[in-house]
Amino acid sequence: MNTVLKKETLSRAERLGEVRPAYLEALTLVERLHRRLLDVIKDEFDRRGRSDINAVQALLLYNIGDKELTAGELRTRGYYLGSNVSYNVKKLVEMQYLHHARSRVDRRAVRISLTQRGREVHDVVTSLYEKHVLTVEQIGGISGDDFSRLNVALARLERFWTDQIRFRL
């Protein structure tokens, strides 16, 4: 019985030894990829001579798209990746990239949607992503199957983290 317990402990320690470096590398890559995506978006706007908007704001406008949302919905739906939703929404309204109006249902809530100017930014990001879709397999060496497997793993990781918060695991 003692031998079985030692094998069980050893195998758990071995699994931990295998998972730890892979998990920590994945965390580093996710964080680095997010920063790199913002760099790619910034570079696209720089190439077009646009310095009126930053990459976080452009990504926010892209994620809003044709929807009409509240700032709270931006956070809860995961569309917003930064820490200060209110600040960027306020700036985008001031710069006329976003419409804002009181909700007809809940007068406390402000609904936001893209202006024509915001749609133009959305279209720049859409065009960038379309260019990537056409070249990522040939130049980046990443196939549709690779993305499918990656998306399954990332969705599982997101669910794991969500459960950590929700159920205080």
Language model: regions and residue ranges:
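N-terminal leader segment of winged-helix/HTH proteins
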Residues: 1-51
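C-terminal regulatory/oligomerization modules of transcriptional regulators
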Residues: 1-19, 142-169
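Charged, amphipathic alpha-helical coiled-coil/dimerization segments
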Residues: 6-12, 90-149
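N-terminal positioning helix adjacent to the helix-turn-helix/winged-helix DNA-binding module
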Residues: 22, 33, 56-57, 117, ...
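Generic structural concept
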Residues: 31-34, 61, 65, 115, ...
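Alpha-helical linker/hinge and terminal dimerization helices associated
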Residues: 33, 37-40, 44, 78, ...
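N-terminal helix-turn-helix DNA-binding core of bacterial DNA-binding proteins
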Residues: 39-83
